[in-house]
Amino acid sequence: MKLTCVLIIAVLFLTAYQLATAASHAKGKQKHRALRPADKHFRFTKRCNNRGGGCSQHPHCCSGTCNKTFGVCL
């Protein structure tokens, strides 16, 4: 009888703990989901480097000019 009560209390405690942690994780995921569409849009937009920023074989300088000797945007 005592063992049964202890097991029931343990199961109730573990269930409550799982529900509490699942709720906190769900809130965290919801926060990241709100940022996800912006991340997808951000990946497809071209970013350019300002003057002094790095450039390489495929320059992405805002000015359109890359000094490939020094690897910087002009």
From Swiss-Prot:
This is Conotoxin VxVIA. Disulfide bonds join C48-C62, C55-C66, C61-C73. Residues 1-22 form the signal peptide. Belongs to the conotoxin O1 superfamily. Coiled coil: none annotated. The presence of a 'disulfide through disulfide knot' structurally defines this protein as a knottin. The cysteine framework is VI/VII (C-C-CC-C-C). GO terms for molecular function: ion channel inhibitor activity; toxin activity. The keyword Secreted applies. Its main location: secreted. Transmembrane segments: none annotated. Keywords: Cleavage on pair of basic residues, Disulfide bond, Knottin, Neurotoxin, Secreted, Signal, Toxin. InterPro entries: Conotoxin (IPR004214), Conotoxin_a-typ_CS (IPR018072). Residues 23-47 form a propeptide. Expressed by the venom duct. The keyword Oxidoreductase does not apply. GO terms for cellular component: extracellular region. It is found in: Secreted. When injected intracranially in mice, induces a series of symptoms such as quivering, climbing, scratching, barrel rolling and paralysis of limbs. Unexpectedly, no effect is observed on ionic currents when tested on locust DUM neuron.
